[in-house]
Amino acid sequence: MLRIAVPNKGSLSGPAGEMLHEAGYQQRRESKELRIVDPVNEVEFFYLRPRDIAIYVSSGKLDIGITGRDLLVDSGAHAEEILPLGFARSTFRFAGKPGAATGIDDLKGRTVATSYEGIVAAHLADRGVDASVVHLDGAVETAIELGVAEVIADVVETGTSLRNAGLEVFGEPIMKSEAVVIRRSDAEPDETTEPKVQQFLRRLQGVLVARTYVMMDYDCRVEQLEKAVALTPGLESPTVSPLHNEGWVAVRAMVPAKEAQRIMDDLYEIGARAILTTAIHACRL
């Protein structure tokens, strides 16, 4: 049975559970559940602190896990990213009082507070900057006001917390993070679990594609078909079927959801009609 770690709380937990549900896996009904078994898919899910997941996976006790890229890197665990999932996106940055610093070189000899000591220490060392790093478990925005540090390094999603604390970001981003699937770096493919791992990844990839694309159907005249197909090439090639009325064809193709409205406008302009889009709930490419 495949053993998978899932975040039990925080910004990773809800979207991870939703994606797994869309991928056809049973999920917990109550937040207090720490372990459930999905007998149909032969998967056992363990709900763990997001910060601990990389450690469990690197130990080999669990086959794969879902966590944040920032948490994976900060842990220093012997685990690697195998699939980005596109949610819980954030940027890790330095911040301070306005005018306190403009770049990383200004941090020499100063104190930086962060909940991600591993990421910050490695980033500073890679750039030859000698600064003190103070580890705090949370609410690092108050570290400057209380005199614990002169600068902080933290995850920035909207920047609201920083602005409320009178802080502003500076310098280049330290890293960009999102939810990722991880596995042990030196994991040897096992004939029992590896097919399940690959099936799991295919399912999640199918969810990602289904969220990104819509199915578009429309009718157009044969003489406008090439122009229409140029607008809707599909992933491989669109499906084209003759209609009962001579000189007309029906076309079906997957198109990027973000571009659907523009494509519909362009199709209408060249004479296509009965244009509609349908949500894709699951797919395999």
From Swiss-Prot:
Location(s) in or outside the cell: Cytoplasm
Activity modulation: Feedback inhibited by histidine.
GO molecular function ontology, one term from the record: ATP phosphoribosyltransferase activity
Catalysed reaction equations from the record: 1-(5-phospho-beta-D-ribosyl)-ATP + diphosphate = 5-phospho-alpha-D-ribose 1-diphosphate + ATP
Keywords attached to this entry: Amino-acid biosynthesis, ATP-binding, Cytoplasm, Glycosyltransferase, Histidine biosynthesis, Magnesium, Metal-binding, Nucleotide-binding, Transferase
GO BP annotation list: L-histidine biosynthetic process
Pathway annotation from the record: Amino-acid biosynthesis; L-histidine biosynthesis; L-histidine from 5-phospho-alpha-D-ribose 1-diphosphate: step 1/9
Superkingdom assignment: Bacteria
ATP-binding in keyword set: yes
EC number per UniProt: 2.4.2.17
Keyword Magnesium: yes
Disulfide bonds: none
Predominant location category: cytoplasm
One GO CC term, this protein: cytoplasm
InterPro entries for the chain: ATP-PRT_HisG_long, ATP_PRibTrfase_cat, ATP_PRibTrfase_HisG, HisG_C, N-reg_PII-like_a/b, N-reg_PII/ATP_PRibTrfase_C
Cofactor(s) needed by this chain: Mg(2+)
Enzyme class, UniProt record, top EC level: transferase
Function: Catalyzes the condensation of ATP and 5-phosphoribose 1-diphosphate to form N'-(5'-phosphoribosyl)-ATP (PR-ATP). Has a crucial role in the pathway because the rate of histidine biosynthesis seems to be controlled primarily by regulation of HisG enzymatic activity.
NCBIfam families: hisG, HisG_C-term
Family from the record: Belongs to the ATP phosphoribosyltransferase family. Long subfamily.
Annotated protein name in UniProt: ATP phosphoribosyltransferase
Organism this protein belongs to: Streptomyces coelicolor (strain ATCC BAA-471 / A3(2) / M145)
